[in-house]
Amino acid sequence: MRVYEFARNYGMTSKELVAICHEIGIEVKAQSKLDETQLATLSRHICRGKDTNETIETTPKVVKKSREAKTIAYVVTECEPFTSLGELGKTAAAFATQTIKDGRSLIIALPKYKEITEVYGTTMEWLMDLPIKVGSTEARASLFKLVQDSVTYLFIGNDRYFTREEIYGYEDDAERFAFFNRAVLEALPYLGTKISEIYVNDWHTSMIPLILNVDYKYHSFYQKVKTTLNIHNLEYQGWYSVDILPNVLGISRQYYDNGLTRMGDSVNLLKSGIETATRIQLNEISTEQLKLPQMHES
C-alpha cells in the first residue's frame, strides 16, 4: 500500500500523513510504498488514545463507493500545486478539494509543462503514447498519471508544445491547446473509468465541447457525457482566422460558415464552447465584465 492510499483510507491528505510519518521516523513521500512494519507502526500511532483492548487493523477496510457516484473530468491549463499564474490554478485546486469531499471521483487533465516535469516527473506513471490529429497531420501525446490526495491527474506531454519557459504567450498557442484538447478526448477512454461530465475552462479548453460534438458524437465512451464551460475571464477569448478550423482543429470550415464558431470576421474559440457546451458557468469577474460596453460591442 502506498502513502496516498493509506491516507485516503484514513480520511486525511497525503501531506498530513507524510508529516506524521516524519514525526515518528518514517521517511517517505506521497508515492512511497509502505511495508508491513511501517503500516503497523502508522496504524498504532493513528489509533493511539483509543481503547487499548481494541483490535487494530493494519489493513484499512475498503470503502465501497455508491453506485450513484460518477467520475468528473476537469480539463484546465493551470492547477495548484503543479502550476498556477493566478485565480485559475487556485480555483481548480479548490474544485478538486470540494469534489473529493462530496464523495465523487475526479480526473484533472493538464498539459505536462516543463516546470511540472522538473518537479513531479519522477513520481508520474507513464501510460502510453497516442497519435493526435493536428489539422491534416499528427503529433504524439505522451500520457502520464499521478494520483495525489484521491485525485487522478492526467498529464498530456509533448516536447514541442509544452517544454517551454512560459505557459502562454506564443504564436502557436491555438495549435498547442487544440492538441491538448483533442489529446484529452483521446486519452480518457484508456483510463478505465466512465465519465459523467467534462468541465472545461476558458478558451484554452473550450474547444473540447466543439470537437466532442463534431468528431466524437457517436463514440460509445462519450454517450450521455455532459460538458460544462467555466468562464473565468472574458478578456481572453481566443480570436483567430478561419484557417484555424481545418489547419489546426482538423474540422470543416462549415462550422464557421454556419456561425457556430464565428464572431464578426473571425473564429472565436470561447464562443465555440458557449455554443456547444451543455451548460455555462461564469464567475464573479466574468459576470462583471459582461456589463462593460466593449463586451457588448464584441
Language model features with spans:
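Catalytic cores of nucleotide-sugar-dependent glycosyltransferases that transfer UDP/GDP/TDP-activated
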Residues: 64-298
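Charge-dense, low-complexity intrinsically disordered segments
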Residues: 1-64
